[in-house]
Amino acid sequence: MITAIVLYELPQSITRQQCLAHFHRIAPGFLEAPGFIRKQFIYAVDGKVAGGAYMWKTLESAKAFYSGPWLDCIRERYGNQPTITYFETFAVADQKDGVSYPIRE
């Protein structure tokens, strides 16, 4: 399992409310991405950066997603190149679902 942290700078013209509304509008579309597991949409408390913490089944599925139309949309909407950092996910603990489990290789 792969966790990807994606960050991009927000233009000053995009307000917190606009960012929130946009995230809510696009969230369902991620469910169709091959290899996608979960995304947490994130917004810096100072309003300067936004992005996501994604979970993917494989590194290949993550890289394929970020090199497709998604990247063009980010560049067009925010006017900058996102930073993407990939991590191997060794374990997950989730209070909401009451689970904690290791990721098997």
Regions flagged by a language model, labelled:
Residues 1-49, 59-67, 80-105:
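Short S/T/G/P-rich N-terminal loop/turn motif that feeds into the first structured element of a domain
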Residues 52-56:
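Conserved RNP beta-strands of RNA recognition motif
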Residues 72-77:
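A common structural junction motif
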